Amino acid sequence: MIGLIKTYDNTLDAQSCNNLIDKFEQFKNQHESFDDRGIVFTQLNMAKASQIWKTEIEKYTKIFQNSFTKYLTDLEISPQQMPSKYMWEPIRIKRYLPNDHDEFKPHVDVNSKQTSTRFLVFFIYLSDNEEGKTTFPQLDSYAECKKGSLLMFPPMWPWLHAGTKPIKEAKYIMQTYLHYV
């Protein structure tokens, strides 16, 4: 199971990460706040303002697609193991503040009929953070919050994971999922 968790450094350059954070902060009217049972963060869904985010949606969907191809190659996954048709979940940016409150406690990303079509997670860290990592507690593994790096893994129950609290500065990630259609 741990072999299906992959991290790719330098998927985005520092300037692209900074630009995404700046634009996220510029459009506060698009922010959605979540605070429910240990799940605390602020999110922006690019699809809800697709004209403002059109360039980013196109650019980063291509990067996610290329990363998916690399993941399949690196893991020697054959075409018969993947769906021939799939779709991307809208790209979101999430911010976790260093306030001893924002975090995403252990969970899985497929836990209902609504989320059951997800089959692969993509997280790009937009900021460096000495904490705020993604942990896989049952697998005794974690991914550092390293600016520009991409974390990919299946979203189902064997990959219980958590986004730990950032300590000194905000943590930003850009994420999407691949879905069965």
Q: Which stretches of residues belong to each language-model region?
A:
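Fe(II)/2-oxoglutarate oxygenase catalytic core
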Residues: 1-150, 158-181
